[in-house]
Each structure stands twice: as C-alpha cells, then as structure tokens.
C-alpha cells in the first residue's frame, strides 16, 4: 500500500560490493582499521535480496556482471538462474563472515568452538584418486599451487597435486631458491611416488642431487614427481629427460633446460617462486568418520647441537650431518620409516 500510495518502483536488482575486509587484513593493518572495514549494511542487503530471490536478483561480485547482462538480453530471468544468484550470495556472505571470525580468532588467540574455512573453487578436476571418483580443487587465489606457473603438460590431476605437495614440503627442509642455499651447499632433489619419497639427496649441484636421489630407488622413480629447491639448469634437464616422470617443480628453469625438458610433451613442468608460499603456522586437517582432525603443521627445525647422545660412543660431526639429513627426510615418510 505504501508503495502504491507513494508511486514507488519495486526493487528487482540489488548490487553490493562489500567493504574490502580481506584486502585490509592482508596488509597487516591495525586492529582499528580492520574493524572499520567490516561491512554491516552490505551483508544485510545481500541476505534480504537473496531470501526474496524469486522477485529480486542479487549480484555480489563484478565477475557476475557479464553473465547477468547476457541473461537480461534473453528477457525475464528464470527461477533456476535467480536461485543460482541467491546461492552465490549466501556463499559470499558466509565467506565474508568466516574471514572475520578467523581473523579475530588469530589476533586474540581464541580457540574457535566451530571450525570454519571458506575456500573458493579453483577448478573441477578430471577425477579423484581413481577414475570413478569426482574431485574438486578449492583454494586461495594467488597463493601456493594455485599460483604456480605450469610451463608445459596436461592439467594437474588430484594425485599430481597430492604428490607435488609432499615433494615440495620435503625439499623445503633444505631451503628454497638460490639465495637460501648458496652458502649452505644444500642443493636438494626429492623424487616422490605414491605420496612417499623414494629418493632424496643434497649435493653441490642440482644435477648431482638428482642423480644421487635417483640411485636410491631408480625403479620406483619411474612415473614419479621430482622437486628441486634451486634453479634447474641444462645439465640437470639432460638427466631428467632420460626417465619417465609425471611432474617437475622448481623455483626457476634456465631457457636451455626448458627446451630440453619440453621434448617430453607430457611432462608437467611447474615453476613456483618462494614469494607464493602461504605464511607459516598453517594447520592441516584429516577427515574421519563424523568429523575432522585439525593440527598445526610440523614446522619445527631441529639443530644437531641440541641433540643429546645417550650412548657411550658419540657420533662424529659427519655422522651428525647424515643423521640430520635422515631425520628431515623421515619426517615426510608416511609409513614406518627407515632412512
């Protein structure tokens, strides 16, 4: 009645861009600045419009605009499209609230009574661990594997991503990129198969590190994943091309090395720089029946000078170096480990 009495038009479209809370906290802003960038009215308008989606269309992200305009040209919006917009709207506000909750929990060291994580869909994978299983990749934009440059090869599979993660976290035990390792002589290479290291080595060059790792178990290395913590040069590439591999990941590749590796058309070549790594103090999760288990990732760094010998014979410095290497690798072996 009020609408009719005042000759008002009905609202049939609501477009809201929320305050940039995530962008604000990424800049490590002050508490007050972050609080100021928590939107109040925006989420209320979005939720109201989404609830009434049969009569109102709601847009929450500029990426939706083009599709909306194309649908508009067709005439009236069908119910399924409006429901899709409502679904995306509620997901958007849920993600926004999750980011706020997680940030406050971290800033004030508060244990959350509910485990809330919101990751956008990166892509639908071809299949999961087996061909009959569906699989999806969710994650943060421009961080981790989502930011890796794939220089060649087919799209990454579910198993590829699991193996790449294990290979990279193992090789990271010895530094990453040239500036980290030139002074320590720890050029490292790890060969991984079925989510377990089957060979690992540190040496005075990436090429020799790979050859040493290959000697650990050249049979299991067939069809495996190789990770380096340093630049891959032509000498290393020549050794890599002699064996069938699924993926190679490194912080950088020489142009000549890429030319050699690209002869193997199906080899997935990935370049991932250190500045794309997530911040430390991340958590890892495991699904169990009826829930999940959450723990801090194991980022501890053991130093040999802190070790205590409990035998009459003390290990030599060389033995300690070997034991330290074995200890680092053992940490990433999934079954009972003998390294």
Specify the residue positions occupied by each region the protein language model found.
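Active-site loop-to-helix "anion-binding N-cap" substructures in soluble metabolic enzymes
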Residues: 1-108, 176, 196, 204, ...
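ATP-dependent carboxylate/acyl-activation modules
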Residues: 12-16, 96-98, 104-339
């Amino acid at each position: 009645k009020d609408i009719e009495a005042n000759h008002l038009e009905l609202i049939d479209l609501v477009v809201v861009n929320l305050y940039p809370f995530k962008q604000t906290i990424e800049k490590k802003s002050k508490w007050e600045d972050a609080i100021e960038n928590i939107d109040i009215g925006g989420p209320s308008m979005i939720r109201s419009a989404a609830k009434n989606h049969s009569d109102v269309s709601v847009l929450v992200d500029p990426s939706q605009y083009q599709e909306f305009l194309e649908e508009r040209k067709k005439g009236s919006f069908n119910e399924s499209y409006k429901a899709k917009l409502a679904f995306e709207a509620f997901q958007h506000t849920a993600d926004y609230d999750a980011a706020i909750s997680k940030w406050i929990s971290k800033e004030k060291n508060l244990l959350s009574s509910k485990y809330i994580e919101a990751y956008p869909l990166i892509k639908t994978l071809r299949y999961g661990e087996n061909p009959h299983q569906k699989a999806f990749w969710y994650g943060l934009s421009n961080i981790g594997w989502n930011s890796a440059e794939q220089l060649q090869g087919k799209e990454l599979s579910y198993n590829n991503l699991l193996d790449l993660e294990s290979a990279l976290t193992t090789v990271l035990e010895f530094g990453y990129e040239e500036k980290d390792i030139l002074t320590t002589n720890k050029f490292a290479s790890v060969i991984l198969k079925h989510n377990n290291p089957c060979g690992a080595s540190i040496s005075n060059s990436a090429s020799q590190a790979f050859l040493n790792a290959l000697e650990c178990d050249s049979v299991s290395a067939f069809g495996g994943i190789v990770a380096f913590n340093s630049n891959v040069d032509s000498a290393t590439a020549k050794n890599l091309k002699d064996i069938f591999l699924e993926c190679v990941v490194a912080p950088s590749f020489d142009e000549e090395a890429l030319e050699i590796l690209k002869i193997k058309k199906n080899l997935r070549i990935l370049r991932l720089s250190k500045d794309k790594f997530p911040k430390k103090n991340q958590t890892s999760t495991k699904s169990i029946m009826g829930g999940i288990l959450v723990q801090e990732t194991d980022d501890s760094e053991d130093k040999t000078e802190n070790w205590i010998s409990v035998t009459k014979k003390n290990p030599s410095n060389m033995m300690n170096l070997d034991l330290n290497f074995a200890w680092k690798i053992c940490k990433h072996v999934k079954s009972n480990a003998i390294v």
